[in-house]
Amino acid sequence: MKNYEIGGQEVVTSVLAKSFSDNNNNVIIACFNQPNKMMVRRTCDAVKVYSLNGFNYSENNVAKLRDILISEKIDIVINQWGLPYIGAKVLEKAKKGLNVKVIAIYHNDPGTNARIKDVEIELSKTDNGFKQLLLITKKNLYRFITSRSMRYVYNHSDVYQVLSPSFVERFKDFTGIKNPKKLMVQTNPVTIETGDFVLKPANKEKEIIYVGRIDYNQKRVYRVIDTWALLEKKYPDWRLTIVGDGVERENIEKQAKTLGLKNVSFEGFQSPIEYYKRARILMLTSEYEGFGLVLIEGMSFGVVPAVYGSYSAVYDIVNDGVNGIVFPYQKEGFSAEKAAIQLQKIMHNDAVYNDMAEKAIETSKRYSVDEIYKSWEETFEKLSK
């Protein structure tokens, strides 16, 4: 990994590491940069965390990683950032002459990342023909570099994983690899334990929550606020709670104030468990996602997901009108008006909520750590043959 910070990919890594360790595997986590101390404390005691000397291709990093592979007797390396060629290149040289297999994972929608999306945002804001031409050229260059980097990682891995069956064709189209025999689908697990939680609808509060980073490039939390602005007066006994932080938080708080919203709370970064236990609905209005981990986290506590269908993997998780709501993706952009109409189906009908919540919990069980480990174990066994 490049980093071991507080984020979805890192949390998945720590949960899987514990599961692998609990199943009698020697597990270590290695990252290029210094790991976040809180993440290290949250990591299973049986799992060692190593760091290299910054994200770069250097003989020092190669030597340090090779020492780890040999001293820890590593058989399989899981590259949790299956895009940059630098990590793959360091690993390729470090494992030379060793019997080490490599699994690479891309944790997003192939063909989409923050750098490409930033250019698209700039492009949408300008009418200047010359600037548009420059930005289109820049976007195409980024796409070319990204696709070639992804191809490099694929070619230097024994298995390459994506998070959804719907991403297989997108991977093929984006990389130009028409017959990717090493490609497979591996979904993420629920990363929060529900403990002894039992759904009791009467204990659920009339609350919509957003959980996650607050930024514009990906999460677009302003859409949640826009939607809530159409609902607050009609449902004065409901509230919206934003759990998370990020570069756009100040702007989002100003937006809520400008709209005169009263029943909105900004909680900052918090453990989401207590919010999952009490809330009825979780909104996710991202412009793109890989998996949307918060969806299955919330679903495991009977929180009905209401999510923008901007990424194909959401349809693996949410069956619109059955275990949640999908706001249809539109080329002209997200419609707060249409989202508000769909949300009211749950907000004013307890029976609808109760049914969806039960089905959401059942869906979340497919993503339990135990179930996900079984599929990983099958992959490990295939690589060992």
Tell me the role of every PLM-derived stretch.
Residues 250-269:
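Nucleotide-activated donor-binding/catalytic signature segment of Leloir-type glycosyltransferases, i.e.
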Residues 139-182, 192:
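A short, active-site helix/loop in glycosyltransferases that binds the activated sugar's phosphate group
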Residues 79-86, 106-109:
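Short His-centered aromatic/hydrophobic patch
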Residues 2-7, 13, 19-57, 167, ...:
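N-terminal strand-loop element at the rim of the active site
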Residues 10-15, 206, 215-230, 247-253:
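A conserved mid-protein helix/loop that constitutes part of the nucleotide-sugar donor-binding site
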Residues 304-308, 318:
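Short hydrophobic beta-strand element within catalytic cores of glycosyltransferases
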Residues 287:
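Aromatic "clamp/platform" in nucleotide-sugar-dependent glycosyltransferases that forms part
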